[in-house]
From Swiss-Prot:
UniProt keyword annotation of Disulfide bond present: yes
Molecular function GO labels: structural molecule activity
Keywords, sorted A to Z: Disulfide bond, Glycoprotein, Secreted, Signal, Silk protein
Record flagged with keyword Disulfide bond: yes
Provenance organism: Bombyx mori (Silk moth)
Record's miscellaneous remark: It is unclear whether the N-terminal residue of the mature protein is Ala-17 or Gly-18.
Residues carrying a glycan: N69, N113, N133
Phylogenetic lineage: Eukaryota, Metazoa, Ecdysozoa, Arthropoda, Hexapoda
Stored Pfam families: Fibroin_P25
Name of the featured protein: Fibrohexamerin
Tissue specificity note: Produced exclusively in the posterior (PSG) section of silk glands, which are essentially modified salivary glands.
Major localization class: secreted
Record's signal peptide: 1-16
Record's subunit section: Silk fibroin elementary unit consists in a disulfide-linked heavy and light chain and a p25 glycoprotein in molar ratios of 6:6:1. This results in a complex of approximately 2.3 MDa.
Subcellular location: Secreted
Length: 220
């Protein structure tokens, strides 16, 4: 009787188990050598370059904010805490032949003198300038590698998520015109910041992956 019950239970378990999951996790999330070797085995990247500095400066970084018809340029952009980013997800989907790599970056800090050019039909740009220092509780970067594209990071799509909410920031106008223009209405700040981080997503993800895990040779 017991043997019959076990047999029935085994059949029930097999029936409820369904097809095997296509998700395969080849590495522990903190095993960067394993992740690096896995990426290198599926691409042309060179593993193990080192680490991003805790602080570094980029002379000029331009990004677009389409919602506000504006182009922004960060001058002498200082980035802090990029070295604190950590891998929070890494898996292969054997069915779709894609690999997902997510990186969580807590308290990224950006400091720069920022120029804004707002574009309008039939008019020249309105150009403004201000100092800004912003700290972001958590920026989450998810990159999807495609085996059909040889796991090419340089053309892979990265999604940027303000997972920790809006930044804590300080702004100081560089001239009177900018002081009069800057709005104290922050109703649309979430739209601006989503587009801002979208504009920086490739640089943030690709520089971390290439410096910390495997160098794909991207021009960020």
């Amino acid at each position: 009787m017991l043997a019959r019950c076990l047999a029935v239970a085994a059949v029930a378990v097999l029936a409820s188990a369904g097809p095997p999951s296509p998700i395969y996790r080849p590495c522990y999330l903190d095993d960067y050598k394993c992740i690096s070797d896995h990426l290198a085995a599926n691409s042309k990247c060179i593993p193990g370059r080192g680490q991003i500095p805790s602080q570094y400066e980029i002379p000029v970084f331009q990004f677009e904010i389409p919602y506000f018809n504006a182009t922004y340029v960060d001058h002498n952009l200082i980035t802090r805490n990029h070295d604190q980013c950590r891998v929070s997800e890494f898996y292969d989907n054997v069915r779709t032949l894609k690999t997902v790599l997510t990186v969580d970056c807590p308290w990224l800090n950006f400091e720069s003198n920022r120029t804004l050019a707002q574009h309008m039909s039939f008019k020249e740009d309105v150009v403004l300038s201000f100092y800004i220092n912003g700290s972001y509780p958590l920026i989450r970067l998810t990159t999807v590698f495609d085996k059909g594209n040889n796991f090419d990071l340089c053309s892979a799509f990265t999604f940027a998520d303000l997972a920790g909410g809006l930044p804590i920031f300080h702004i100081n106008p560089n001239d009177q015109r900018t002081a009069q223009w800057l709005s104290k209405d922050l109703t649309l700040l979430h739209i601006y910041e989503r587009e801002h981080i979208f504009g920086k997503r490739n640089w943030l993800a690709r520089s971390f992956i290439s410096r910390t895990l495997c160098d794909f040779g991207c021009q960020h």
